[in-house]
Amino acid sequence: MTTLFRIESDRLCLRCGQAGLDESRPLTAADESRFRGWLQDYHNPSRGYGNEPARLRLGRELYAWLDGDAGWLARSRATAPAPWIVDFRGPRDPDGLTRLFLQLPWELLADDRGHLAADLALRYT
């Protein structure tokens, strides 16, 4: 099963057929600022690449933002067989906000137990 996150205009859309999810929420100037801060942290050697506690914190912040008030990730994971495939997409000619979204280090997604990519049962890809 694939969980698809895509940017359409000024909205983040989620589609996960198996979980019955087809929802969207607006993207705001605050989201753009948040994306810039996360990318800056990720590319800062003292706070990103080589600093595992900082990478874990960033992964948890990304998870919390993507999950949102509606619990998108939790609801998708609840029905996901392994491997849990998550796809991030934007339009063919992305604007600045979409580029930032697509550049985020989604491989770092983490919950309270750690990085999702390290969960052998989930097999997040």
Ranges and model annotations:
Residues M1-T125:
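Non-catalytic, solvent-exposed interaction/assembly segments
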